[in-house]
Amino acid sequence: MSGESGFKNKSISEIVKEIYENIDGMTMSGKKDGNSNIGGFIATRHKEWYDKASIVNIIYEGYVTYGGMTGRDMGAMAQGLNESMDFEYLKSRCKQVEYLANKLDKYGVPFQRPFGEHALFIDAKKILGHIPIDDLIAQTLAIEIYLEGGVGSVEIGTLLADRDPITQEN
C-alpha cells in the first residue's frame, strides 16, 4: 500500500478525520466500508442537501424521525467503523483484492484497471457480450458467480443505472 507522503506518519483515523473535515457531503454503506451487517448513512454540512436527501430517503427508509436502523445495528456499525480504522485490517482487505486481481489476470477475466483497494469491477459486457442489454448482463454475471462459487457480488451496471426516464430503455 502506498499513499501521499504528507500522511505517511498519520493513523488511519487521523486521515479519515482530515478527509471528513474537507467534504461537503458523503454516503457510506455499512456492509462494505463499515464492516457491519446492515445500514449506512448520508452526511452533509448543508441544510438544503439534507432536506432534499430526507425527501428521497422516505422512499427507502421512512421519515427521518422514525425510519432507519435499530440501536443494535447502529452499535454494530459503530464497532465496525472502529475496527475498519485498523491498518492491518485494511492491509488485509487490500491484499484480498490484489489476490483476486492476480487470479482473474491468470484466467484472462477482464476487469477495470486500476483496481481499487475496496473492490474489483469485472467487465461483464466483455464476458457476456452475447447477452442482450435488456437481459441485464452484469446482474446475470453476479448471479452466475454466486451459483458457481458461492461468492456474493453486486452489479454496477444496467440495473443499478436504472432506465432512461424518456425511452424507458436500459
Swiss-Prot record:
Superkingdom assignment: Eukaryota
Location of N6-(pyridoxal phosphate)lysine modifications: 32
Named cofactor requirement(s): pyridoxal 5'-phosphate
Keyword Lipid biosynthesis: no
UniProt-listed InterPro entries: ArAA_b-elim_lyase/Thr_aldolase (IPR001597), PyrdxlP-dep_Trfase (IPR015424), PyrdxlP-dep_Trfase_small (IPR015422)
Keywords: Pyridoxal phosphate
A molecular-function term among this protein's GO annotations: lyase activity
GO biological process: amino acid metabolic process
Pfam families for this protein: Beta_elim_lyase (PF01212)
Family (UniProt): Belongs to the beta-eliminating lyase family.
Name the UniProt record assigns to this protein: Putative beta-eliminating lyase-like protein
Organism whose genome encodes this protein: Dictyostelium discoideum
